[in-house]
From Swiss-Prot:
Lineage: Bacteria, Bacillati, Bacillota, Bacilli, Bacillales
Similarity-based family: Belongs to the eIF-2B alpha/beta/delta subunits family. MtnA subfamily.
Species of the source: Bacillus pumilus (strain SAFR-032)
GO biological-process terms attached to the record: L-methionine salvage from methylthioadenosine
Active site location: D240
Gene label: mtnA
This protein's name: Methylthioribose-1-phosphate isomerase
Stored Pfam families: IF-2B (PF01008)
An example Gene Ontology molecular-function term: S-methyl-5-thioribose-1-phosphate isomerase activity
Subunit structure: Homodimer.
Length: 353
């Protein structure tokens, strides 16, 4: 690991298991766990031991490749049917992050013409590893493209964690901050805590500090005051799914930041790879929004903080309409207007996606 980049990887492929950084333990402990079965992988995704759209996709791809090694048949058609069943099981872990389905579908395409079970098993492993390799370069390029939007001295706000541990390396929304550090550009980050699971407080501040990036933590309800008093230059966030018209689903609270940024005339950017786009989804109204366990809101670290019988509404994501977005930063460039047309053109140029 390079001296200027000290953030551990969130997921790695091993000979007979998957090694993950348990993000539920951060920042108090840095704990790595081994996943051996598809059930282990499913549980790790559902319980947020692994989270972040690209990291979820990589982990699921590894999970499919790993589980396929245990399929006992020499019939390639039977093998493919069992792989499809594993794919459908893993795909049900989280409904909003489109990278999950994208990665699994990519593995299925890889073995469409496989002549033997052994060849298919090898191909699945190679393709899953290739997804991780490509994601690192994709994130680095997103960071390079985003960096041109900022100058030394800028104060930038973010929410949730769209960083290195949410991807293979660097992250999406946080990628420019690591690259800025390497180039000695002075950027200061304001990280919203991100209730109720506190990904901003627990993960973003932790990894930015690991990487030597200047960061200040704020509570979510301090965002407006901070934008005004600290003269925030821009807001940059990640995304879990982007519709064809540019509407973007991201962690709950993102929409609030976009509305506030519009009020204060602050640029609001989404940073995401092309694999996060779902061109089959016309607009944000068609994006499924995951609702999570009410205990995430009623308890903190096992301690009750609300009446046990109170009703809870706990959506994990919200959708920011494209008209509130100043630009979508991808590995292929920055989309700044006419989102449907530009997204269509982008995918026409990259038909393999």
């Amino acid at each position: 690991m390079s001296k200027e980049f000290e953030v551990p990887r969130s997921v790695e492929w091993e000979e007979n298991h998957i090694n993950i950084l348990n993000q539920q333990k951060l920042p108090a402990e840095t704990v790595f766990e081994h996943l051996y079965t598809k059930e282990d992988v499913y549980d790790a995704i559902v319980t947020l031991k692994v989270r972040g759209a690209p990291a979820i996709g990589i982990t699921a791809a590894f999970g499919l490749a790993l589980s396929a090694q245990d399929i006992e048949t020499e019939d390639i058609d039977v093998f493919k049917q069992e792989v499809i069943q594993i794919k459908e099981y893993l795909n049900s872990a989280r409904p909003t992050a489109v990278n999950l389905a994208w990665a699994l579908e990519r593995l299925l395409r890889r073995i469409e013409r496989a002549a033997s079970v052994n060849a298919a098993k090898t191909d699945l492993v190679h393709e899953a590893i290739q997804i991780q390799i490509e994601d690192e370069e994709t994130c680095r390029q997103i960071g390079q493209n985003a960096l041109q939007l900022f100058k030394s001295g800028d104060r930038i706000m973010t929410i949730c964690n769209a960083g290195s541990i949410a991807t293979s390396r660097y992250g999406t929304a946080l990628a420019p901050f690591y690259l800025a550090k390497k180039k000695n550009l002075d950027l200061h980050i304001y990280a919203c805590e991100t209730r109720p699971v506190l990904q901003g407080a627990r993960l973003t501040t932790w990894e930015l500090m690991q990487g030597g990036v200047d960061v200040t933590l704020i509570t979510d309800n301090m965002a407006a005051h901070t934008m005004k008093e600290k003269q925030i230059s821009a807001v940059i966030v990640g995304a879990d799914r982007i519709a064809r018209n540019g509407d973007a689903a991201n962690k709950i609270g993102t929409l609030s930041l976009a509305i506030l940024a519009k009020h204060f005339q602050i640029p609001f950017f989404i940073a995401a790879p092309l694999s996060t786009f779902d061109v089959s989804t016309k607009d944000g109204s068609d994006i499924p929004i995951e609702e999570r366990d009410p205990l995430e809101v009623k308890e903190f670290n096992g301690v009750q903080i609300a009446p046990p019988d109170v009703q809870v509404f706990n959506p994990a994501f919200d959708v920011t309409p494209h008209h509130l977005i100043s630009g979508i930063i991808t590995e292929k460039g920055i989309i700044t207007s006419n989102y449907t047309e530009e997204i269509d053109a982008l995918f026409a140029e990259n038909i393999s996606l």
